Design a protein with these regions (language model features):
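Carbohydrate-active catalytic/glycan-binding domains of CAZyme proteins
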Residues: 1-255
Length: 255
């Protein structure tokens, strides 16, 4: 999405810095990508947020807009009344954005600190059937990583934790797929629901040599209106792919 070196602004950054945790969303004919821009450890705010947008998912995208709110794991939520918000970690913190999501127009405030209360991050909001559903990654990024969900009738809460939490977690230390968390719900054009989340495959002595990978499992909705992932069985090592048209993308890079 960021193709020009001057727009990327990666010069002189130390190892492990740069862009973290990108998230994509759609609003009024445009695709929005937001990510954390991790600077070196200087200044008052060294984890800023960027937003780029395009009318096509493959781009070209706009120049990055910088939002000077410290945190990680940004996501954008668009409410029914047209107001737009960004969420960040340290629980689920929220602040309002302007119409084109290039400026912060309110102070950040805490929605909910999570159900597990340990390292809550990766917040995403979904509005469905009159509820705001708040998804969070909790438990740290090791074996205790998990996805929890809470809900409220009002955007600013009070949020009620799901009685089935965590709705995604690997409980078997011997399984190959571990460290499951930071999930985002998506609905296909056929009406089916899925959870996109990160995980790590434990190879040999426990290292995930491919780092964090992307996983997909189905979401079902309980009679009392809660989303659960893969029938609460944890991550699936093999899953039937969604029945959707295939998309062919060509990599035009010379590298």
């Amino acid at each position: 999405a960021i193709t020009e070196p001057e727009g990327a602004a990666l010069d002189d950054l130390e190892g492990g810095r740069g862009y973290w945790a990108p998230d994509i969303s759609y609003y009024k004919g445009r695709f929005y990508i937001t990510a954390t821009y991790r600077l070196n450890d200087t200044g008052n705010v060294y984890r800023k947020q960027i937003v780029v947008s395009s009318d096509k998912p493959e781009g070209p995208y706009s120049k990055p807009a910088i939002i000077d709110e410290d945190g990680i794991d940004p996501s954008i939520f668009n409410d029914d009344d047209g107001r737009r918000y960004m969420l960040l970690n340290r629980g689920a913190r929220i602040f309002e954005l302007n119409e084109d999501a290039t400026k912060q127009i309110s102070k950040a405030e805490l929605l909910f600190y999570g159900d597990n209360k340990r390292a809550p991050e990766g917040p995403h909001l979904l509005k469905k059937d009159g509820y705001y559903y708040l998804f969070e990654a909790e438990g740290g990024t090791g074996p205790g990583h998990r996805i929890t969900v809470s809900r409220s009738r009002e955007l600013k809460g009070i949020y009620e934790p799901c009685p089935y939490n965590p709705i995604m977690r690997q409980n078997n230390p011997d399984e190959i797929i571990q460290r499951c968390g930071h999930g985002k719900p998506v609905q296909t054009q056929n009406g089916d629901w899925y959870m996109v989340y990160l995980c790590g495959r434990k190879i040999g002595d426990g290292y995930s040599i491919l780092g964090r990978e992307t996983a997909l499992d189905p979401i079902s909705w309980t009679m009392d209106g809660w989303p659960i992932v893969n029938n609460l069985k944890g991550p699936s090592a093999l899953q039937v792919k969604p029945d959707l048209p295939e998309m062919i993308w060509e990599d035009e890079s010379d590298d």
